């Protein structure tokens, strides 16, 4: 395939991305490597809660020390749960990538296109209202989506999505509203 070059003649680009997620204890989905398909437990809740209380702050310290920019796939309900995380993201001038409302639900929970469009709008409006600009990127909770999700994201103004781990470089996807950039997410190194 065609050689892919980055601006300035650079040959390599790296996307540093964290997933900052929130869950209500005992409600909705809660992935657990040890017990697939079982309801959420204190183990998978506390594992994720640790990330918001301790883990993300260690990442921020490391990113600051190494002077690395980052993008953060972030649930919109986090504004209610841990708004101090957004203060740190703003201070660092990092990018916020919309990541659904909560990882206790995903877009496959919404069977009708209109329902999914409302969820995308709700998430987008929450970020826009808090950050004064809409997020450019989207990664669905659990990287789940429906057959029309790329169409709905493009129609909602998104420039890229990260739900397709289909390549080692960005690719363009066709949608009914025009091209949408797919930035492949390395699912094989995700902590879940």
Segments from the language model and where they lie:
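Aromatic-anchored helix/helix-loop segment that forms the rim or "lid"
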Residues: 190-192
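Catalytic alpha-helical scaffold of carbohydrate-active enzymes acting on polysaccharides/glycoconjugates
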Residues: 1-182, 187
């Amino acid at each position: 395939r065609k050689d892919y070059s980055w601006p300035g003649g650079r040959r390599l680009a790296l996307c540093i991305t964290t997933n900052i997620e929130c869950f209500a204890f005992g409600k909705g989905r809660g992935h657990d490597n040890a017990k697939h398909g079982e309801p959420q437990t204190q183990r998978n809740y506390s594992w994720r809660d640790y990330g918001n209380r301790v883990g993300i702050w260690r990442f921020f310290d490391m990113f600051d020390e190494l002077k690395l920019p980052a993008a953060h796939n972030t649930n919109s309900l986090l504004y209610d749960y841990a708004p101090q995380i957004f203060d740190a993201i703003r201070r660092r001038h990092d990018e916020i990538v919309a990541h659904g409302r909560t990882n206790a639900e995903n877009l496959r929970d919404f069977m009708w296109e209109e329902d999914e469009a409302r969820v995308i709008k709700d998430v987008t409006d929450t970020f826009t209202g808090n950050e004064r600009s809409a997020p450019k990127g989207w990664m669905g909770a659990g990287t789940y989506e429906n057959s029309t999700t790329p169409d709905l994201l493009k129609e909602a103004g998104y420039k890229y999505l990260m739900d397709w781990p289909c390549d080692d470089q960005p690719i363009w996807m066709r949608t009914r509203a025009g091209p949408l950039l797919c930035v492949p997410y390395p699912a094989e190194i995700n902590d879940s």
